[in-house]
From Swiss-Prot:
It is found in: Cytoplasm; Nucleus. This is tRNA (guanine(9)-N1)-methyltransferase. Gene3D superfamilies: 3.40.1280.30. Monomer. Its EC number is 2.1.1.221. Residues 1-19 have a biased composition (Basic and acidic residues). Residues 120-356 form the SAM-dependent MTase TRM10-type domain. The lineage of its organism: Eukaryota, Fungi, Dikarya, Ascomycota, Pezizomycotina. Residues 20-32 have a biased composition (Low complexity). It holds the Pfam family tRNA_m1G_MT.
Amino acid sequence: MDLDPAHKPSQAEETKEQGNEQGQVEQNQAQQDPTTGPQAETEKAIIPSQGSTIPQKRSAEDEPAQPMSKNALKRLRKQQQWEAGKEDRKLKRKDSRIARKVRKREERDALIAQGINPYANKQKPPSVNVPISLIFDCEFEQYMREKEIISLGSQITRSYSENKNAKYRTNIYVSNWNGKLAERFHQILDDKHQNWKGIDFVEGDFIECAEKAREKMKHENMIEPLQRSLTEKSPWARDEKDPLPLPDPEPEPRPEYSDIVYLSSDSPYTLERLEPNTSYVIGGLVDKNREKGLCYKRARERGIRTARLPIGQYMVMQSRTVLTTNHVVEIMLKWLEYENWGEAFMSVIPKRKGGKLKEQQGASGETQETEEAEAEDPEEENEETKDPDAEASASKQNTPKVEVTSK
């Protein structure tokens, strides 16, 4: 049926149409307003009332903090102090390096002013490999904190550097190379230690390292100090009193390990000389002497000879006589050079420890005391282990060339 365009809707139809439009507008507003409508009612239904017994999930910030022990609080404060002083230590090391460079430059300029070539005759003779092996026993990580493991890594790095530049060079082995220390060298040094010469990193224990060293030492040079060790008195002496008495009797060393000596300050035997074709084991333990006698007991259980450096026979110390790993290595290297324990101790032990040679009777009967040789205090432990080969290479590259006219 055709609609008439002239037809007008009635009043009832207009009222109905207006009502439909108003209802549509209210529905749209209700959907847009989050505080009203079915969505708001749903959210209100989800939110529990104040008196609800439904358990609420508490955030980590709302959890009550567990009380810390005194030791844990003390460690936390020391760590905070260490972190707070990191920048100051960094600046001190930088100032020390600058002062050292200025001093060397002044000395060099003074020689040039005198017409002397400051670089003449500075090349050291090549090192001589000797039939002595030093083994770092690194099976003590469970007894050390992270900071102490970092310190041990730095000591091993310094030991390698000292041995590399020594007049008489030994073979160095690092045993039990499969823990956090190895992971640190992998991450910090990017495995550059694998290119170091004269040092082997072994996953096995120190006995496996000694077996490797036994074959290698057959072809080393027998220098005079070691040659005399074969003909003179016994290379070690039994002390009258045990530094660490144990209830069980001392076992006999196993004959197949007669060429292995475990160094320990708790040993009742004192080294008189270093023996050729012998491996000396150094405990890789940095624990501020918490684990008393750990290395000594470990050696006894394995049937290994033990000995300690003769510090008490030659030195008077104002502080504890426990030395770092790199100090032990340096002392043994110096003995090979001087063949004298007193000179070796004085050239290595830091001056801050207040070490002096024991009093000696003079010709006139008066007591004389040997003056303490100056030993530079080792630099403070760096936060990162550095590659000594890279540092040596950089030092050579930065050395300027100076032409000096001869007289």
